[in-house]
Amino acid sequence: MAKTKKHLLTQEGLKKLQAELRLLVDVKRADVIKLIQEAREQGDLSENADYDSAKATQSEIESRITEIQDILNHYEIIKEVDTKNKRVIVGAKVTIHDHSDECNYTYEIVGPIESDPAENKISHESPVAKAIMDKKEGESAEVIGIEHPYKVTIKKIVL
């Protein structure tokens, strides 16, 4: 039997997913069922745009519910670690110096489900995170970028 992949989540990410699931199941699912019933009352369903739209929304909601349930059935919380021996791990906030543009960037290393570049949350599977994982402050690493490799130096790690 194939081993199921564990989804890495922070405690905050777990709470967000649980809240989203409750909203979808308790509120949005009921709302869309009501919309479908109202559209059915309009008569002929073959050319009923409201019905088609409500069914498409229902499909999206059910797909997301299934996706979240799968995540919640196969997750692992990112554990707190000994802060004396600071190394880059999943869950850490890391400030790096990018030598290609001489700028500093701060990222939080998270699991793929929580990654959101707009919030500076990058997946531990991303090229930057892969390059700096398990390194200490002051150490450098080569990131295998899309266009070319580049060097970064770890300035600060907050666990």
From Swiss-Prot:
Superkingdom, natural source: Bacteria
GO biological process, one term: regulation of DNA-templated transcription elongation
Keywords: DNA-binding, Transcription, Transcription regulation
InterPro entries in the record: GreA/GreB_C_sf, TF_GreA/GreB_CS, Tscrpt_elong_fac_GreA, Tscrpt_elong_fac_GreA/B, Tscrpt_elong_fac_GreA/B_C, Tscrpt_elong_fac_GreA/B_fam, Tscrpt_elong_fac_GreA/B_N, Tscrpt_elong_fac_GreA/B_N_sf
Pfam hit, one: GreA_GreB_N
GO molecular function: DNA binding; RNA polymerase binding
Similarity field: Belongs to the GreA/GreB family.
Its job: Necessary for efficient RNA polymerase transcription elongation past template-encoded arresting sites. The arresting sites in DNA have the property of trapping a certain fraction of elongating RNA polymerases that pass through, resulting in locked ternary complexes. Cleavage of the nascent transcript by cleavage factors such as GreA or GreB allows the resumption of elongation from the new 3'terminus. GreA releases sequences of 2 to 3 nucleotides.
Protein name: Transcription elongation factor GreA
